[in-house]
Amino acid sequence: MDKLADLNYTLSVITSMNDTLHSIIEDPGMAYFPYIASVLTVLFTLHKASIPTMKIALKASKCSYKVIKYCVVTIINTLLKLAGYKEQVTTKDEIEQQMDRIVKEMRRQLEMIDKLTTREIEQIELLKRIHDNLITRPVNVIDMSMEFNQKNIKTLDEWESRKNPYEPSEVTASM
């Protein structure tokens, strides 16, 4: 464990990796060498960082699988961020939590839609009743003979003088 965290050991491993790469690739004009060296350096650093972390985590915790899974997911997400990706790796637990949250939100929205639909149906029924009350219905022909002022009307034949008493007659007035 001490050897894993020792800086001199780490530097000697990096130096030996670089020497090995230089011996494998003897062409000095190799264009991809810096990229290969960078990737190998990152992988080596992750290896050096993850092994002690995993060992400490396994000794310190009772639930080793979850800790290892969390460490691996964190390392992969860090690599993805370093590479410039916006996506992230998630564990099943996180996915299940998100799914539960989404299902709860969908249930809440369905209840809201149900309440709103019920209210809208009630409003439509109320508007229908109001409309039915406001509609003018055709009325049958009213018998005007039953009105008060026309009950005792006499016809021209029924009058004694055969003259309408309500017609204006000639009036002479003095000046």
Swiss-Prot record:
GO terms for biological process: monoatomic ion transmembrane transport; symbiont-mediated activation of host autophagy; viral process. Residues 1-28 are lumenal. Keywords: Activation of host autophagy by virus, Calcium, Enterotoxin, Glycoprotein, Host endoplasmic reticulum, Host membrane, Host-virus interaction, Ion channel, Ion transport, Membrane, Metal-binding, Secreted, Signal-anchor, Toxin, Transmembrane, Transmembrane helix, Transport, Viral ion channel, Virulence. Ca(2+) binds at E120, Q123. Pfam families: Rota_NSP4 (PF01452). The N-glycosyl content is primarily Man(9)GlcNAc, with a small amount of Man(8)GlcNAc. SUPFAM superfamilies: Rotavirus nonstructural proteins. GO terms for molecular function: channel activity; metal ion binding; toxin activity. It comes from the Viruses. One of its GO terms (cellular component) is extracellular region. Residues 52-175 are cytoplasmic. The chain crosses the membrane at residues 29-51. Plays an essential role in the virus replication cycle by acting as a viroporin. Creates a pore in the host endoplasmic reticulum and as a consequence releases Ca(2+) in the cytoplasm of infected cell. In turn, high levels of cytoplasmic calcium trigger membrane trafficking and transport of viral ER-associated proteins to viroplasms, sites of viral genome replication and immature particle assembly. Homotetramer. Interacts with the immature particle in the viroplasm. Interacts with host CAV1, early and late in infection. Interacts with host integrin ITGA1/ITGB1 heterodimer. Interacts with host integrin ITGA2/ITGB1 heterodimer. Interaction with microtubules blocks trafficking to the Golgi apparatus. Binds 1 calcium ion per tetramer. This is Non-structural glycoprotein 4. It comes from Rotavirus A (strain RVA/Human/United Kingdom/ST3/1975/G4P2A[6]) (RV-A).
